[in-house]
Amino acid sequence: MKLYPAIDLLNGKSVRLTQGDYDQVSLTEDPLYQAQRLTDAGFAHLHLVDLDGARAQRPINRTVITRIREQTSAFIELGGGIRTLAAMEIYLTIGIDRLILGSAAVSDPDLVEQAIARFGSNRIAVGIDTRAGKVATNGWLTTSQQTANALLTAMQQRGVTTFIVTDIAKDGMMQGPNAQLLADLQQAMPQATIIASGGISLLADLHRLQTAGIQAAIIGKAWQTGAIELAMLKQMEG
């Protein structure tokens, strides 16, 4: 199983939020130290989120993101505040491997199609963040009327092959992922690569996701709190 330890950036620091609430910040750490720690542990993939960018709707933490890129050879995917082709160009030029478009997929689906045409489907993913069955945008501060299934279908028709799916109610709660939602989406779209995000707190959660047909997952609070040791996660990844 492919694992993406997460580093969420707020004011240049690595933090964890609970259910995406900017007022519930915990675990403030040095993101460069965390990235090095993950690299030293052998992880080949990192998931970065610019929380300031998601809220401001434009890139904010570019300096620290660039420094993380410079210090690790890991595959890095990045989301948060990426709303223009120019912003995508900047991040891809500094060596970010894949960009995650979230709010833009809802507000400007043509932009997603343009990005894929320009950069390739392997460099662009779509983040689908759900709250009570509906897609949330703008750093999870706004909830649209679009369902996860509808957005996934629409984006797949525009050439998207990789999706990061988060159930906001599970995020940061350490109570297990919404395996049923993920399984339903994967079954409906078997050709899509779905990366699970939110709620993973035990190795058993990862086994459940594998059983549901999910072959990649983002690990946030679980690795940062030590709920799952990095050595055990690396063993799970193989």
Curated annotation (Swiss-Prot):
Q: What does UniProt list as catalytic?
A: D8, D129
- Pfam families noted in UniProt: His_biosynth
Q: Which UniProt keywords apply?
A: Amino-acid biosynthesis, Cytoplasm, Histidine biosynthesis, Isomerase
Give an example GO biological process: L-tryptophan biosynthetic process
For this protein, what is the EC number? Answer: 5.3.1.16
Catalyzed reactions: 1-(5-phospho-beta-D-ribosyl)-5-[(5-phospho-beta-D-ribosylamino)methylideneamino]imidazole-4-carboxamide = 5-[(5-phospho-1-deoxy-D-ribulos-1-ylimino)methylamino]-1-(5-phospho-beta-D-ribosyl)imidazole-4-carboxamide
User: Listed GO molecular functions?
Assistant: 1-(5-phosphoribosyl)-5-[(5-phosphoribosylamino)methylideneamino]imidazole-4-carboxamide isomerase activity
Question: Where this protein primarily resides, as one coarse class?
Answer: cytoplasm
Pathway per the UniProt entry: Amino-acid biosynthesis; L-histidine biosynthesis; L-histidine from 5-phospho-alpha-D-ribose 1-diphosphate: step 4/9
The lineage's top-level taxon is: Bacteria
Q: Which SUPFAM superfamilies match?
A: Ribulose-phoshate binding barrel
One GO CC annotation: cytoplasm
Say if the entry is tagged with keyword Glycosyltransferase: no
Q: Which family does it belong to?
A: Belongs to the HisA/HisF family.
Protein name per its UniProtKB record = 1-(5-phosphoribosyl)-5-[(5-phosphoribosylamino)methylideneamino] imidazole-4-carboxamide isomerase
Species this protein is from: Lacticaseibacillus paracasei (strain ATCC 334 / BCRC 17002 / CCUG 31169 / CIP 107868 / KCTC 3260 / NRRL B-441) (Lactobacillus paracasei)
What are the top taxonomic ranks of the organism?
Bacteria, Bacillati, Bacillota, Bacilli, Lactobacillales
